[in-house]
Design a protein with these regions (language model features):
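Short functional micro-motifs and their immediate structural scaffolds
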Residues: 10-11, 23
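A phosphate-binding catalytic loop at a beta-strand-loop-alpha-helix junction
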Residues: 155-169
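Active-site-facing substrate-recognition patch
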Residues: 16-86, 94, 120-150, 187-191
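Glycine-rich phosphate-binding loops at beta-strand->alpha-helix junctions
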Residues: 89-101
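A structural signal for isolated positions on well-ordered beta-strands in alpha/beta enzyme cores
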Residues: 86, 154, 181-184
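Histidine/lysine/aspartate-rich catalytic loop segments that bind and position anionic ligands
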Residues: 106-127
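PRPP-dependent phosphoribosyltransferase catalytic core
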Residues: 167-191
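Short cysteine-rich clusters marking metal-coordination/redox-active sites
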Residues: 3-6, 15-18
Length: 191
């Protein structure tokens, strides 16, 4: 196999050099009183994140999130947060042979961060890609939760643009008295 960016021989779709060359730029936004952490600038990984629409994305996206997850676990450990936190990928339904959000969750969860799958699903499956804020507001996801309401959770999504999906998910979990300590996004489109 060859690295998709430099075309050198590699066992993974991104060689270690190219992966290390992608700078982490931790950003924090607050939605519904919850901190949302993102790790890359959208412009830096735009072509890579678009791989989520193809099967190769199941190999590329976890590499990006493994790097981010390792850095985030260090931050949690420095703050003394070692209790288990359970990740919920937003709407991890299988599309195009895999679930990109479940692949991201698997790549991100390390140390005391544990993945949970199939917990938060959207009943409305309309795609928000390239749609206006008005369209997003008029077509809510209408989430359903299946899981243990007593665990401590964090949410995970691929891109945060307007924050509509994360806001809706956080509001919904709040109505169920489910604690989401923070949210994670691979990248933020508001550079």
């Amino acid at each position: 196999m060859r690295c998709l960016t430099c075309l050198r021989l590699s066992f993974k779709p991104l060689c270690p050099n190219c992966l290390n060359d992608l700078p982490l730029s931790l950003k924090v936004r607050v939605l519904e009183g919850v901190s949302v952490y993102s790790f890359y600038a959208y412009s830096e990984i735009e072509e890579l994140i678009k791989s989520k629409y193809a099967l190769i994305g199941s190999r590329i996206l976890p590499l990006l999130f493994q790097k981010a997850g390792a850095e985030f676990v260090k931050i949690l450990q420095e703050k003394g947060l070692n209790a288990p936190l359970y990740g919920i990928a937003i709407d991890d339904k299988i599309k195009s042979f895999y679930s990109h959000s479940a692949a991201l969750l698997k790549g991100f969860c390390q140390g005391n961060l544990k993945p949970t799958y199939g917990r938060l699903r959207a009943n409305n499956t309309i795609s928000y890609a390239g749609k206006s804020l008005e369209f997003r507001a008029n077509n809510p996801r209408n989430f359903t939760f299946k899981g243990d309401k007593n665990l401590d959770y964090f949410l995970l999504d691929d891109i945060i643009t307007t924050g509509t999906t994360l806001k809706e998910a956080l509001k919904y979990l709040k109505t169920l008295n489910i604690k989401a300590h923070f949210a994670i996004a691979l990248c933020s489109a508001d550079e």
